[in-house]
């Protein structure tokens, strides 16, 4: 398990500044000496991590969902990206459309869900002044307001917001 956490961190490495040839050499050595031929094991490890996360943090339809670790959350999207990157050596999720792994509408759903979930998570952190992942009842109302949701004649803003949340979480579940 720890080995695959480290592999995932290494998978995310990128050149920021310094010696570009050294960064290229690191990347080449990682792919040739560490990642090559281990895709099946990496996928199994990531799927097991997901299963354990879902057991611990619950289903997407929990009334107070975990936006990061829960089913249909950000970690599910990240896991899909990491698997794609490991198997196909992609740099962007959009590359999966060109590889015929995703249809363009699935890529669009991925992007919209990722943008929405990150916006929710950032609002949660901002409003609570700390890193918090559980979207509690009280926080749901505040996040809905902060994200511009308004009451309609038939429904409260928080209900509309949570319906959007569950719609995105369901799409993430469908994609992953």
What does each model-identified segment do?
Residues 1-176:
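A nucleotide- and high-energy phosphate-metabolite-utilizing enzyme signature
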